[in-house]
Amino acid sequence: YRNPSFRELYLYRMANPELEPETMMNYEISVGKSFSRYLGASVTAYYCKGDNMIQTLDMKNQNTGRFINKGVELSLTSHPFSSLMLSATYSYLHTSLENLTGAPRNQYYLGADWHASDRLNISADLKGVGGLYVHESVDRQSYALLNLKVAYQACRYACVFMRLENITDSRYVINRGYDMPGFTALGGVKLNF
């Protein structure tokens, strides 16, 4: 059970004082296993049944009515070396709602985190989304984002970092009317005292 927030009811352009509370029952089962120090896996299945989920459609907060969401999530982790961690996840969602925003049918993630030395850390990830509903006037979105981060601990108090996000310059939308940024590069210094 969740009452609409003050923001959902009264603030900004999406406000809707007629919103009803959300009700939901969620069932989840999960099993995980570490096969060795090198490999671990888990599987989670879920079933969710509810009424009046609050979402934003056509720039207004609305209740969805009755819904059933069910899906499965798979996860693998590996430590082939003490300095390297690999991870992979996949998620599938089936929903009874044709227009459920912000909930892609398929998602995956592949990640690598390498501690190249005591001072240098390099991580990369690939995040993919398929079948994301945005609006009836926008095609369902499917995209992949490749990201890279390099961090160097220059001294006890300072870490220099660089991030490259959306390296492949994928074009996608997650909210109607708001294109997401293409390739982005940023860097900085993080100070710890």
Enumerate the predicted regions with their spans.
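Outer-membrane beta-barrel signature, preferentially recognizing the C-terminal barrel domain
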Residues: 1-79, 100-105, 136-140, 180
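Residue-level detector of conserved, well-ordered beta-strand and adjacent loop positions
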Residues: 7, 20, 125, 163, ...
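Residues on the lipid-exposed face of transmembrane beta-strands in outer-membrane beta-barrel proteins
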Residues: 29-33, 74-78, 88, 110-114, ...
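Gram-negative outer-membrane beta-barrel transporters
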Residues: 45-50, 62-135, 159, 168
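C-terminal beta-signal and adjacent terminal beta-strands/loops
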Residues: 51, 86, 128-133, 148-193
